């Protein structure tokens, strides 16, 4: 169990009009912030949690509350993993009618977390009314994101390497309402430790043109971004030697 509470005093500013007349205005009212966290550890490194954040402001301005339930489960061998998050945001006393705006967000994932072959499938969703900016980091809402990770590793040493890792990543994003393409990306990575304990790796990736619906800040418009193809090669000298060296080559091609 965790609980945090903080209180901030009202804040004021002196403003002056064109006639040099000054007046004192309230820029931020008396405000109370609190966070409540309930967490229960379960067998097999599993857990469930409930988090609630609340911001109360005195006077006629709005108040905000966000509640989220999280869960993460593993099987007995810690080989398979699934979990997620369901959250709801409420902004109270907004507008002339003092209505409540309720938003919704969810996240679900499933994967294999041990063994030579591993993978993870993830989906995140947020409607256009979900808002956590009163207490927390907030970028944007109204999206549906899907991602897939697949990896394969060779941990048994051979004649030329000690270990080798290969992974594939893909990402696809849409605006939820109205449903429109936002962005996508795909890349493949390989990393290895050689017999002389040097490390080396390579990566190739591609991102098609994307649509940024937030950048124009004008309803009905969007920013069309470029498509990108890129690659990376790197070699790192053995770290335990007196001198360390790292060579990194990166290629990027962008076009509209």
Task: Give residue spans per PLM region.
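Conserved structural-core and active-site-/substrate-pathway-adjacent residues in large, well-folded domains
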Residues: 1-3, 38, 68-71, 121, ...
């Amino acid at each position: 169990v965790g609980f945090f509470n903080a209180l901030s005093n009202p804040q004021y500013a002196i403003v002056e009009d064109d006639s040099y007349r000054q007046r004192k205005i309230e820029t931020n009212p008396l405000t109370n912030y609190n966070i409540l966290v309930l967490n229960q550890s379960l067998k097999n490194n599993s857990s469930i949690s409930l988090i609630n954040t609340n911001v109360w402001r005195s006077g006629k301005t709005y108040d905000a509350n966000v509640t989220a339930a999280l869960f993460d489960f593993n099987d007995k061998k810690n080989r398979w993993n699934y979990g997620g998050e369901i959250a709801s945001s409420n902004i109270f006393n907004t507008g002339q009618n003092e209505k409540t705006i309720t938003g919704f967000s969810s996240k679900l994932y499933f994967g294999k977390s041990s063994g030579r072959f591993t993978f993870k499938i993830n989906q995140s969703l947020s409607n256009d009314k979900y808002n956590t900016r009163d207490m927390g980091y907030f970028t944007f809402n109204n999206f549906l994101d899907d991602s897939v990770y697949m990896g394969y590793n060779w941990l048994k040493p051979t004649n030329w390497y000690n270990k080798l890792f290969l992974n594939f990543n893909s990402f696809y994003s849409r605006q939820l309402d109205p449903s429109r393409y936002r962005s996508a990306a795909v890349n493949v990575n390989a990393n290895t430790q050689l017999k002389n304990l040097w490390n080396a790796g390579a990566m190739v990736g591609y991102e098609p043109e994307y649509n940024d619906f937030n950048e124009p800040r004008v309803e009905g418009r969007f920013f069309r971004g470029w498509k990108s193809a890129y690659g990376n090669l790197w070699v790192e000298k053995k770290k335990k030697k007196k001198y360390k060296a790292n060579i990194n080559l990166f290629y990027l091609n962008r076009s509209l």
